[in-house]
């Protein structure tokens, strides 16, 4: 075996050190920003792309496309409803807990604007029952919505704002006892405008009621995106997103605003059905990351 002199060793040392530095740098760069765990995480609302999928299909497709979470919208083919028995609820919970896909939300259509006291009570009690379902499934939040102002019925805007806020206080307190958040989607005729929506949130007396940002055109009105975002920024706990190819919506600015609050929750795609859903989901995730410079 040929021996190496001290002089030869010293001469080659810088190259060895340099090679190690390059290797270490490459290793450090091997974890891409997309997989770092920092920043918002992409998810899916079953409305409407996954409306016809059962739970195993939802989990399989989200896993393949690297979607981190799902919101199960009520009435869809997954069948996750309050009618499930305790055994069935445990089975659904285990399916998600044994997968990389988080059951992040249950999407309801409960609303609190009706001038009919019986309808209002039905929605409040239904929300409480839905929160119990979420708790049984290991899901930490449910989506509800305002829906409409009732001025055509002779009811003032302020009366409806107060009624919705009071109802949210009731359901928020009830859901807190289940360990489940109530997330109010920015939605509805007039109630999706931020002077109205932010007033509802301000009047609600439950700290367990949060904002589900919904990426509406109305976000850009009444002072614009940044102004409206700041009105509710500290309460945003969930985000619904539509098609990211919609150029009229300032996606990069929204991601900047979310980053400014330290938001690392879920942004769930609420997009139309497709004959090639997995391809759509892969492109969606790529755009989602590209807008944040995380690719």
Task: Give residue ranges: language-model regions.
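Short secondary-structure transition/capping segments
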Residues: 81-85, 116-119, 154-156, 195-197, ...
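Histidine-acidic metal/acid-base catalytic patches
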Residues: 2-43, 50-65, 191-295
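Conserved beta-strand positions in the central sheet of alpha/beta enzyme cores
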Residues: 71, 105-107, 143, 240, ...
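Receiver (REC) domain switch/active-site residues of two-component response regulators
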Residues: 68, 140, 237
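Residue-level recognition of beta-strand->loop/alpha-helix junctions
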Residues: 48, 73-74, 107, 186
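Residues that line or immediately flank small-molecule/substrate-binding pockets and catalytic motifs
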Residues: 46, 74, 110, 146, ...
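Active-site acidic/histidine proton-transfer and metal-coordination neighborhood
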Residues: 13-21, 29-34, 56-59, 63, ...
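Glycine-rich, proline-tolerant flexible connector loops at the mouths of alpha/beta enzymes
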Residues: 73-93, 147-152
């Amino acid at each position: 075996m040929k021996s190496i002199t001290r002089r030869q060793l010293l001469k080659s040392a810088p190259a060895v050190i340099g090679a190690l530095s390059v290797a270490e740098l490459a290793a450090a760069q091997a974890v891409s920003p997309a997989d770092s765990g920092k920043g918002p995480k992409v998810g899916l609302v079953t409305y409407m792309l996954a409306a016809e999928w059962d739970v195993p299909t939802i989990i399989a497709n989200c896993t393949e496309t690297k979607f981190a979470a799902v919101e199960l919208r009520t009435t869809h083919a997954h069948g996750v409803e309050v009618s499930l028995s305790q055994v069935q609820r445990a089975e659904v919970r285990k399916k998600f807990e044994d997968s990389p896909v988080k059951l992040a939300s249950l999407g309801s259509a409960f609303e609190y604007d009706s001038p009919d006291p019986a309808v209002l009570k039905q929605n409040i009690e239904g929300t409480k029952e839905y929160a119990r379902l979420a708790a049984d499934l290991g899901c930490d939040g449910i989506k509800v919505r305002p829906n409409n102002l009732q001025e055509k019925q002779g009811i003032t805007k302020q009366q409806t704002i107060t009624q919705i806020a009071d109802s949210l206080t009731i359901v928020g307190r009830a859901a807190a006892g289940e360990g489940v958040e109530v997330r109010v989607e920015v939605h509805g005729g007039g109630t999706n405008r931020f002077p109205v929506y932010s007033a509802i949130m301000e009047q609600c007396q439950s700290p367990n009621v949060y904002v589900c940002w919904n990426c509406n055109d109305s976000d850009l009105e009444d002072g614009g995106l940044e102004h409206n975002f700041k009105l509710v920024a500290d309460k945003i706990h969930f985000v619904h997103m539509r098609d990211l190819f919609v150029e009229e919506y300032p996606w990069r600015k929204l991601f900047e605003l979310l980053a400014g609050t330290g938001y690392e929750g879920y942004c769930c795609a609420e997009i139309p059905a497709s004959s090639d859903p997995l391809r759509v989901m892969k492109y969606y995730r790529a755009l989602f990351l590209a807008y944040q410079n995380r690719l």
